[in-house]
Structure formats: C-alpha cells, structure tokens
C-alpha cells in the first residue's frame, strides 16, 4: 500500500473541500461531458539513488494532479489524466537542483519509469583568525564554473556567513561540480581615520589560501560527498588609496567601484571625500583597478589600474570618456523556399531596444557579450537599434559598451548567422575589441535561411505506435567549427525516441545524448574530448537533412555510451 498524501489533513478545510466537491457536480452539460471524457491512467515506477542504484523510500513523487510517497522498495503509483504533465521527485538529503522535473506524456501502455535522485553534496568551511579571536560573522561567497558562450566563467552560487564557532555550511550543491570559495574583505574600525593612519583588517582569501581567484584552486565535489575546507585569515594593514577625477558632465562626483584583476568587486567601494576633492579607499597589498560609469543619454566610462605594495597610493586620476555606439551592418541572404526548416523563433514587436519606434526596421537577431578580460561575472546583453534617421534598412548600431575584449554570441530570430566580422576579424574565432570611448570597427553580419536538419533516434526505440513516455535525453549538436550561434539542442521523449534539430547551420557536428543540457568550455581540450567521446560526427549541407542513430543515455551516467 502506497502512503498517499491527504490534501485535506486540516479539519478546518473539510467544509471548503465539501464546497469544492459540490461545485464540481454543478456544471453545464458540455463541461460535464468534457470532464467525463478525460481518461486517467496509472503511472508506475521506482525512485533510485543515482550513485548506489538502491531504492529510496519515502521520496515525494508529485504529478501535480496526484502525489504519493514511495514505499520501502522505492516504488510509486500515480493516477494522472491523459496528456502532458510534469513529475517532480524530492527527498531530504538529495539535491533539489536537478531541473524542473520529469516531463511525461501520460497515456495507455505506459512503461514503468525509473527516476534517479542525486545524493546531496555539501561543503563545510572552518575559519581560523591569525589573532586567535573568534571567527564569527565572516562572509564568504561561493562561485560555480559555468560556460558562457562556450567560455568558462565563475558565477556566484551563494553567500554564507560563519557562526560563533567560525563554521559555515554549503548544502544542496550541484555535483559533480567544482566550486571556488572566497572570503570577503573586512576592516577594523569605522569613520574617517586621520591622514597617514593605517587601518587593519583581513584581506580576502580564496580556497585553499590564495589572495585572489586567479591563483585559487577549485574544490571539486562528487554526489553525496561531504567535503571540508579550512581557511586561515591573516590580519594585515590596509593602506589609503586616493583617486581624483571621475566627475559627471554636471561636475558631480561619480561612484567608483574597485575590483581585483579577476573582476571581483571589493567589499567596500571608494568613498567621496569633499575635503580631499577625491575618492578614498583602504586596501591591502594587491593588484586592482578602479572604474566609474554613467549610463543614460550621455554615457561615459573610465578605468585606472594600480597596485598596493606596503604603502599608501596617491596621485591616481581616473579620467572618463564618452561612450559611443558601434555601427552594425546586417545583410540577409534569404531564399524564397527553405527545405532546411529555417524556423521563425520570434514574431512580435520591434526588438530594437528602449525608445525605438515600432515601424523601425527590426534587426532580426540579438547579441550577447561576455568579457574575455575577466573570469568573474555575468554576460551582458547588447541591444541593437536602427540608426536614427538612416534610410538604410540594414543599418543598425550596438548600444554603448565599455572598453575591453568580448566574445560575441548571436541569436537569430529567423535563419542563422553565417558570418560576423569587425574590421576584418572573424568574431567567431576572436573576441570583439572595444577601445577607449567604446570605439570599435564596424560589425558586419550576414544572416542566411538555408539551414539543414538533423533527424535521428536514440537507442533502439520502443514498439511502433507508442507515443507516450518520459523526456529521456537531451540531444546536442556540438559544432566542430567556430561559430557565434547557439548550439542546436532538442529533447527526446520515450516512445519511438526520435528527434529533429531544425535550422542547423551548415558544417560538421558531434551529436551526443545526455541527461541534461550540455555546458561545454570550447577552450578546454580535455573537456571537449570527454563530452564528444560518446557521440557521432555528421556533416550538414545547406538545406540538407542528415539522419543519425545515437546510443541511449545510461541512467545516472549523464551522457551517451557509444
């Protein structure tokens, strides 16, 4: 007997339940007929530990319309209406970060399902201060490595604070995965110290004892692992840094942010001191940069790099320059007929950006930029808008961007980007270089709609005619050539196990099946070899179709086994 959940445990809800039940009987004939026509089917299966493959008892299996706890053998039985639904499986001690659930098409002749839960990974941090004082209320930030536009970056995972024992806990971690853990800078005292005064505090430390992320080591955890991390924070002097300049057009001082060379912001921003006519900050030894930025009709940006080495830093002058838009020319080479299935992914209002007119030409694509100069932080959008007053329907401009080197990712609403260059540089191979004032060579983009298709089957399939089952795999077509386009992907449901990738740019691909969407660092040769080892190579011609057969995903393994 399965322990079924009682949705109306509270006696106070009995009357409400009766009203709802009664209301369900008061319906007009067409509605009642539709209700009677809805068929309910049994959905059975088992929940297993992804590491040990042992059954998990008392796991919650929630099918939206019905929910139940698994028995001692990990088995469950739901009664769900026909059609698509989502089944979510949870259990304390197992990761809750396994996506949004299992998509199941409910119908007749359903097979028994096997759902896996990943044992929760955790990291316990223990902090010691060099002074021997209590290490309570020390703030830490954890970063997880993500692949943005095919390039690895450290993105913030969460923030943690030590307790009275100097301990912090990171729970429910995605595993297997790697994490970078860094403490925040902390200073003693408050207010404005007298000139020449040296403050003391604890500089940031990244596991296992590095001064900044660039020299830190990632801590890798596996499913179910309970890892430990030891930190020793050393009390050091913080020296005064004064930065002049950085004023707006109206003469008002601009806010100045200070970062280490990885791009990670310092805990304390520079403070404006009227009596000095400059901004002031206190920093430990290290390499930094300060930046100031204004967004709006008159955008401006300035940056200055500096180092602190056993003494105060004076005479820094941060100069800001106006930012300018970057010209973008978009050429569309569309054919009248497209057998490759160039799907329109967007249809609606103009995507030119805030303040644009609805009757202005639409660029038909979006751009995102991710910095090649910093290893920390998010990718940013790069709004395109039609050049105001231009009669050329293909003349656009990229909104003001700060100086630096950026990898470009393109998202075409129709067709695909076949080429993108800036000053003759192929942006699929090299980053976009934006100089002082946001200056860059014009960007030239060509969009085509003669993409091909990749069709195929995962595994040997199931008996012909079966159209029901669970989302069992993700298919990724990993480009074996430089591109700024998103990686073609598709979900494969149980049943006949077929898939179709539409609007695929011509070129060679490695087709792989996995349990979740792939994150790939194209600059990591070992990772590329690991991810593509179990796949099949195909070449897609313009407007052509390629068919492949991919081995089924091994449960709990995460990728195809070919």
Model-derived segments and their meaning:
Residues 85-103, 180-216, 292-303, 401, ...:
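A short, solvent-exposed loop/turn motif at the edges and junctions
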Residues 15-29:
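Bacterial N-terminal signal peptides
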Residues 41-43, 48-65, 82, 129-150, ...:
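Short, ordered, surface-exposed loop/turn motifs in non-cytosolic proteins
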Residues 65-79, 148-171, 262-278, 372-397, ...:
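Short, acidic Ser/Thr/Gly-rich low-complexity loop/linker segments typical of extracellular
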Residues 35-138, 145-149, 169-172:
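Periplasm-facing N-terminal accessory domains of Gram-negative outer-membrane beta-barrel systems
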Residues 54, 77-84, 169-180, 185-186, ...:
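Short Pro-Gly-centered beta-turn/loop motif in secreted/extracellular proteins
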Residues 41-49, 74, 123-129, 231, ...:
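A short, amphipathic beta-strand motif
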Residues 35-37, 102-124, 211-235, 305-323, ...:
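Extracellular beta-sheet/turn segments enriched in Thr/Pro/Gly and aliphatic residues
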């Amino acid at each position: 007997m399965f322990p079924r959940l009682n949705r109306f445990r509270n006696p106070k809800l009995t009357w409400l339940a009766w009203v709802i039940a009664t209301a369900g009987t008061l319906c007009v004939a067409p509605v009642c007929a539709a209700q009677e026509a809805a068929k309910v089917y049994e959905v059975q299966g088992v929940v297993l530990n992804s590491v040990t493959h042992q059954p998990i008892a008392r796991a919650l299996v929630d099918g939206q319309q019905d929910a139940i706890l698994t028995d001692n053998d990990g088995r469950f039985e739901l009664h769900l209406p026909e059609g698509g639904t989502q089944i979510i499986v949870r259990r304390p001690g197992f990761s809750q970060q396994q996506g949004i659930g299992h998509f199941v098409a409910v119908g007749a002749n359903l097979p028994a399902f096997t759902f896996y839960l990943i044992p929760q990974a955790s990291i316990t941090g223990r902090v010691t201060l060099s002074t021997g004082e209590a290490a309570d209320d020390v703030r830490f930030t954890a970063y997880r490595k993500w692949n943005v536009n095919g390039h690895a970056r450290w993105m913030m995972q969460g923030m943690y604070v030590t307790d009275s024992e100097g301990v912090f806990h990171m729970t429910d971690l995605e595993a297997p995965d790697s994490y970078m853990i860094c403490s925040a800078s902390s200073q003693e005292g408050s207010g404005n110290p007298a000139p020449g005064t040296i403050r003391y505090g604890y500089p940031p430390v990244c596991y296992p004892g590095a001064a900044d992320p660039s020299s830190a080591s990632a801590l890798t955890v596996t499913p179910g692992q309970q890892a430990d991390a030891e930190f020793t924070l050393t009390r050091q002097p913080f020296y005064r840094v004064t930065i002049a300049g950085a004023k707006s057009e109206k003469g008002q001082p601009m806010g100045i942010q200070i970062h280490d060379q990885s791009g990670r912001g310092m805990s304390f921003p520079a403070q404006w001191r009227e009596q000095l006519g400059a901004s002031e900050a206190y920093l430990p030894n290290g390499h930094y940069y300060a930046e100031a930025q204004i967004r709006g009709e008159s955008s401006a940006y300035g940056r200055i790099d500096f180092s602190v080495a056993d003494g105060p830093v004076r005479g820094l002058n941060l100069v800001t320059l106006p930012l300018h838009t970057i010209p973008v020319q978009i050429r569309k080479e569309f054919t009248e007929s497209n057998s490759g299935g160039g799907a329109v992914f967007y249809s609606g209002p103009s995507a030119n950006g805030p303040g644009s007119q609805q009757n202005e030409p639409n660029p038909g694509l979006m751009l995102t930029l991710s910095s090649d100069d910093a290893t920390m932080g998010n990718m940013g959008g790069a709004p395109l808008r039609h050049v105001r007053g231009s009669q050329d329907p293909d003349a656009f401009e990229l909104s003001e961007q700060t100086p630096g080197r950026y990898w470009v990712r393109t998202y075409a609403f129709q067709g695909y980007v076949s080429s993108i260059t800036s000053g003759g540089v192929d942006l699929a191979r090299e980053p976009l270089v934006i100089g002082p004032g946001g200056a860059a060579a014009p960007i030239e983009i060509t969009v085509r709609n003669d993409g091909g298709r990749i069709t195929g089957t995962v595994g040997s399939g199931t008996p012909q005619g079966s159209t029901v089952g669970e989302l069992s795999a993700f298919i990724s077509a990993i480009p074996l050539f430089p591109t700024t386009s998103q990686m073609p992907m598709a979900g494969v449901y149980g049943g006949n196990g077929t898939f179709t990738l539409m609007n695929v740019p011509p070129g060679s691909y490695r087709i792989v099946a996995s349990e979740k969407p792939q994150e790939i660092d194209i600059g990591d040769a070992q990772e590329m070899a690991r991810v593509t080892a179990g796949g099949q190579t195909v070449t897609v011609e313009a407007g052509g179709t390629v068919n492949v057969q991919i081995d089924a995903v091994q449960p709990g393994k995460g990728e195809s086994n070919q």
